[in-house]
Design a protein with these regions (language model features):
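Beta-strand/loop-dominated core regions that host nucleotide or nucleotide-derived cofactor-binding catalytic loops
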Residues: 2-58, 62-120, 125-126, 134-181
Length: 181
């Protein structure tokens, strides 16, 4: 999604949003990530939230010139990796084995065997279409954010096919975006 993303080429407009839209976004994010309820006012302060419209119907939620969350076609909101590194417990975790790391860092989707092999881990609460944080075996910080395409039980029983669609990963265009004006 953000492999070759740059603000100059892909963001068409940035605008201040109405308070009602702002409340709606905060409510959606609070509902989606209940562990952030205590700190949501710090993450998304009133009056400083902007929406940047990008290509492919992507909305970027910008606070203090930094992208905090994004979504595509009014789908679920995903945190950026910078925010996820500040609040690592905000979303369910999945860990892939060492063999999948270089492919994930290249933007590839993650196959089920990457989670079922020796270094893999899948959280109990994983359902289909759940935003998840992807960790590498033996590493402290998340390397990607993804959307599950299989439930936990399907990952272990089928053990083939795409388990997680990678939507944002370390060193992609969104990671390298330092500010949105």
């Amino acid at each position: 999604m953000f492999k070759r993303f740059t603000v100059e080429e892909h963001v068409s407009s940035t605008s201040q949003i109405k308070n009602s839209v702002q409340r709606s976004i905060v409510n959606q994010i609070s509902e989606q990530y209940p562990l952030l309820v205590d700190v949501i006012e710090q993450i998304l302060p009133k009056k400083s939230m902007l929406i940047a419209k990008a290509q492919d119907n992507i909305q970027l939620v910008v606070v203090n010139n930094e992208v905090i969350f994004y979504n595509q076609m009014n789908g679920p909101f995903f945190p950026t990796l910078r925010l996820l590194h500040k609040y690592p417990t905000m979303m369910p975790k999945m860990q892939c084995d060492k063999g999948a790391v270089r492919f994930v860092l290249g933007g590839a989707n993650i196959m089920a065997p990457g989670f079922t092999s020796a270094g893999g881990f899948v959280a109990e609460s994983i359902c289909v279409d759940t935003p998840v944080a992807i960790y590498a075996e033996g590493k402290q910080h998340a390397m990607a954010v993804g959307l599950t395409k299989m439930s936990r039980s399907d990952i272990f029983s089928v053990n083939k096919g795409i388990a997680v669609e990678t939507v944002h990963y370390l060193m992609d265009g969104l990671w390298q975006t330092t500010s949105v004006q």
